[in-house]
């Protein structure tokens, strides 16, 4: 009798574990299918699967070391329609992507992709144009300058990004947008940064100034522009 009871309990436990495994697999399938729909721009499949995801803000990874929320995947694949749909679903914009060290917001991903439409959307919804992504001064404006994206740089400045960056945040380096723009030899970006008040006399922790970088590149136009703005 005891052996029968033990066997019965074992079968019940096995059944519960099997159900749990099936539910977990089904949950994974809905995540995978939703991500696939986002990537392919399949709105019908997106709507069909997203309703089965309990927490759209949970970070989920497939075959990479990085993890994304549903909004993060929508930004990754630059699907504006689904981005807007997820925002209507109250998706969190402050943590949509994570690597081994940091968690990044939706604005980070939009700037990283150089997608001016998404950048404008997130800024209009209150995203912080001066958010710090690390202790070395990485911020949206530094990113846009690094990517040579003039339209995104203009948008960030229009929405209050500090033309001088975030200054010293206690890291090993200080990153100034103007230094980056000069290093990229992008005269239009240099002009817009100066227009919004970027200082020409800043120096990084190695002592280099914007004009030093311009001279190293032998960019006469930028050298003249910086000298005139002193």
Go through each PLM region and give its residues.
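Bacterial N-terminal signal peptides
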Residues: 9-16
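N-terminal leader/linker segments that initiate helical-solenoid repeat arrays
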Residues: 22-51, 58
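Ankyrin-repeat-protein effector appendages
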Residues: 22-34, 159, 196, 205, ...
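Ankyrin-repeat boundary/"N-cap" motif
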Residues: 27-36, 59-72, 96-107, 132-141, ...
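Conserved ankyrin/ankyrin-like repeat signature
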Residues: 45, 81-82, 117-118, 151-152, ...
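Ankyrin repeat domain, specifically the short helix-to-loop turn at the C-terminus of the second helix
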Residues: 50-57, 84-93, 120-128, 154-163, ...
């Amino acid at each position: 009798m005891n052996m029968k009871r033990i066997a019965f309990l074992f079968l019940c436990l096995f059944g519960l574990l099997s159900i749990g495994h099936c539910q977990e697999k089904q949950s994974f399938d809905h995540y995978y299918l939703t991500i696939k729909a986002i990537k392919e721009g399949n709105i019908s499949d997106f709507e069909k699967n997203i309703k089965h995801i309990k927490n759209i803000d949970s970070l989920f990874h497939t075959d990479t070391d990085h993890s994304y929320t549903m909004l993060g995947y929508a930004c990754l694949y630059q699907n504006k329609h689904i981005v807007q749909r997820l925002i209507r679903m109250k998706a969190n914009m402050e943590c949509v992507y994570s690597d081994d060290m940091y968690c990044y917001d939706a604005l980070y991903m939009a700037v990283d992709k150089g997608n001016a439409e998404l950048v404008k959307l997130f800024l209009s919804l209150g995203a912080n144009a001066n958010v710090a992504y690390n202790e070395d001064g990485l911020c949206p404006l530094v990113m846009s300058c690094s990517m040579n994206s003039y339209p995104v740089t203009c948008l960030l400045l229009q929405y209050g990004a500090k033309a001088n960056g975030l200054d010293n945040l206690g890291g090993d380096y200080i990153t100034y947008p103007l230094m980056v723009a000069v290093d990229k030899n992008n005269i239009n970006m240099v002009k817009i940064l100066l227009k919004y008040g970027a200082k020409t006399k800043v120096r990084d922790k190695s002592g280099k100034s914007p004009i030093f970088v311009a001279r190293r590149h032998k960019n006469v136009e930028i050298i003249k522009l910086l000298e005139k703005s002193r």
